[in-house]
Amino acid sequence: MTQYTLKQAGSLLQSKQISAVELASAYLAAIAEKNPALNGYITIDQDKTLAEARAADERIAQGNASALTGVPVAYKDIFCQTGWRSACASKMLDNFVSPYTATVVQNLLDEGMVTLGRTNMDEFAMGSTNENSFYGAAKNPWNPEHVPGGSSGGSAAVVAARLAPAALGSDTGGSIRQPASHCGITGIKPTYGTVSRFGMVAYASSFDQAGPMAQTAEDCAILLNAMAGFDPKDSTSFEREKEDYTRDLDKPLKGVKIGLPKEYFSEGNSTDVQTALQNTIDLLKAQGAEPVEVSLPQTKLSIPAYYVLASAEAGTNLSRYDGVRYGHRAAQFGDLEEMYGKTRAEGFGSEVKRRIMIGTYVLSHGYYDAYYLKAQKLRRLVADDFQTAFARCDLILAPTAPSAAPKIGADTSPVETYLSDIYTIAVNLAGLPALTLPAGFSGGGLPVGVQLVGNYFAEAKILGAAHQIQLNSDWHGKRPE
């Protein structure tokens, strides 16, 4: 019962072939069996889950259900939810039970979706491996010696392991797309401002965007329909007409121009990634799409620009965690200043501290112009590159990561880890939508994904192209043994 896609589960619930309680119970049993080894979930509450499932069954019986009523979903631990611990995988918030619910979570609760639990992540969404979690690293379900990616590693892992039909993630520099690639699932980062950020713990406010993670592009489209929409509580939310993100799913690819950035098809990619890209190009050409070469020359500048800007925003956003109002507080201190220092030293992990220090430095007097202001100018150049490319193509095909998932505990420096985000970060700098879908496997049996990037608000076009690829391939249908 836990092998269904989100769409299949919804159809079976609506036709009353299964009940929401039966489906939730099946997932809870699978979670109890497999999660201790996987560590994909960090908070589970069976009583709350089954109460939501019973309410969904009542709604279905009364005939006022939506297509998602009764379908289970997992939430990355970055989304606040009333009555649930919302820790952001940090010691700083280990005892924080949210008094309110994020808008995007409320949207899904309003549809009648059933909460399975809270998924593991890199602390405050800072990381690419899920090893920065206070609760220990989540494992890759294809090989537990490897990382699931990050920062939405737990969400990717539970969907791949069939411990949830879908999950919510957030993407600041690739945190939906990179773990989706490493775990062999589909995930989309929408255009910045499409999904409300209210109630999503802030890392870098001008980059953060929530998105769906599921087995298929079709599932992501269905879920995004419920997630997206204007929210007056979020000042960065776009006020636009409600879209149907499933509208292009059946649209053929004949004549669609697919941009291939020459800077992304480089020697830096593993053979497995090159093969996955070629597999996808061949599938697109077979369906009538037209590959065209494009150039994104500022790609090499995206890493330094991103880590300056995101760290600056993180340093500001995380200043609120001081031990005064909520969260961790040092047990012993002499005065207020010592309490601040000890609380933050104890409450934050090493990667979070590193980024706060970088952010404080680049915003300090004498360095603002040299680093922060220059990075903002680079951000504009990166965005302009994409607009030049989209003048020649409809969508861009690119790698998601240079290789398959690395091993847990791999001896890599922070800079080496940052460089693994080379293909995802530029999209966040520009605020564009992008989707990762499975496209093959490494020689070691690990999934490899590729990404489709679209222009602003082209989510339906991206999802349609991905769906057409998945209709003609079965990488998304593979699951770990």
Curated annotation (Swiss-Prot):
- Enumerate the Gene Ontology biological process terms: translation
Report the EC number(s), separated by commas if there are several.
6.3.5.7
Keywords in alphabetical order:
ATP-binding, Ligase, Nucleotide-binding, Protein biosynthesis
InterPro entries in UniProt? Amidase (IPR000120), Amidase_CS (IPR020556), Amidase_dom (IPR023631), AS_sf (IPR036928), GatA (IPR004412)
**Reactions that this protein is recorded to catalyse:** L-glutamyl-tRNA(Gln) + L-glutamine + ATP + H2O = L-glutaminyl-tRNA(Gln) + L-glutamate + ADP + phosphate + H(+)
* Active site residues per record: 76 (charge relay system), 151 (charge relay system), 175 (acyl-ester intermediate)
Q: Which GO terms describe its molecular function?
A: ATP binding; glutaminyl-tRNA synthase (glutamine-hydrolyzing) activity
One GO CC annotation: glutamyl-tRNA(Gln) amidotransferase complex
Q: How does it assemble?
A: Heterotrimer of A, B and C subunits.
Q: What does this protein do?
A: Allows the formation of correctly charged Gln-tRNA(Gln) through the transamidation of misacylated Glu-tRNA(Gln) in organisms which lack glutaminyl-tRNA synthetase. The reaction takes place in the presence of glutamine and ATP through an activated gamma-phospho-Glu-tRNA(Gln).
State the similarity comment: Belongs to the amidase family. GatA subfamily.
Record-given protein name: Glutamyl-tRNA(Gln) amidotransferase subunit A
Which organism's genome codes for this protein?
A: Neisseria gonorrhoeae (strain NCCP11945)
The gene designation is gatA
